[in-house]
């Protein structure tokens, strides 16, 4: 696990937002977004932008898939009401939603074969869910990966 070090340098959210504003005004970036942020963090950025007349963040890049729906807990509400769009990543859950790892399969060259420490999507519950999703896809003549990506596009 991660151990917080009180002596670690911290850059305030306001200072970060001011620096990004300078880049935007200089034409080096068009918009400001965040990645792997919480609903609280997004709302703090938005509050500071409004309070100090700075550009608001417009995107959040977080994981989102059929088997990782944590975005829906609070961030979806922030996105809807504050206009902060999701740029989803890990939409195939490290390739798990393709079905290629079902029944303990370890395809040569596949991410979970090469990097076995990535076990986030290898648990029993996830494997059961993936098997059900793959079954649904096959019954409807869909590619499991296409079905998983279509879910994220909704």
Where do the PLM segments sit?
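Glycine/proline-rich, positively charged
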Residues: 1-67
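Glycine-rich beta-alpha junction loops
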Residues: 38, 64-68, 90-97, 151
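Conserved short secondary-structure transition element at the edge of the structured enzyme core
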Residues: 24, 91, 113, 119-154
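Surface-exposed amphipathic alpha-helices with a cationic face
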Residues: 21-24, 46-49, 76-80, 134-138
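Soluble or luminal CAZymes and related metallo-dependent hydrolases
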Residues: 12-16, 37, 71, 125-129, ...
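Hydrophobic packing residues within well-ordered alpha-helices of enzyme cores
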Residues: 42-45, 79, 97, 152
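Aromatic-lined glycan-binding groove of carbohydrate-active enzymes
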Residues: 71-110, 142-143
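Conserved, mostly hydrophobic/aromatic
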Residues: 32, 60, 79, 86-89, ...
């Amino acid at each position: 696990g991660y151990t917080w070090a009180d002596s670690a340098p911290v850059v305030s959210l306001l200072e970060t937002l001011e620096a990004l504003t300078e880049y935007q005004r200089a034409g080096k970036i068009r918009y400001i977004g965040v990645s792997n942020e919480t609903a609280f963090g997004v709302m703090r950025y938005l509050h500071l932008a409004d309070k100090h007349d700075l550009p608001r963040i417009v995107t959040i890049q977080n994981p989102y898939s059929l088997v990782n729906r944590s975005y829906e807990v609070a961030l979806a509400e922030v996105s809807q009401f504050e206009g902060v769009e999701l740029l989803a990543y890990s939409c195939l859950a490290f390739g798990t939603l393709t079905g290629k790892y079902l029944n303990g399969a370890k395809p040569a060259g596949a991410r979970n074969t090469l990097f076995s420490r990535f076990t986030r999507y290898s648990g029993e519950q996830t494997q059961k869910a993936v098997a059900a999703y793959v079954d649904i896809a096959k019954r409807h003549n869909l590619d499991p990966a296409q079905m998983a990506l279509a879910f994220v596009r909704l």
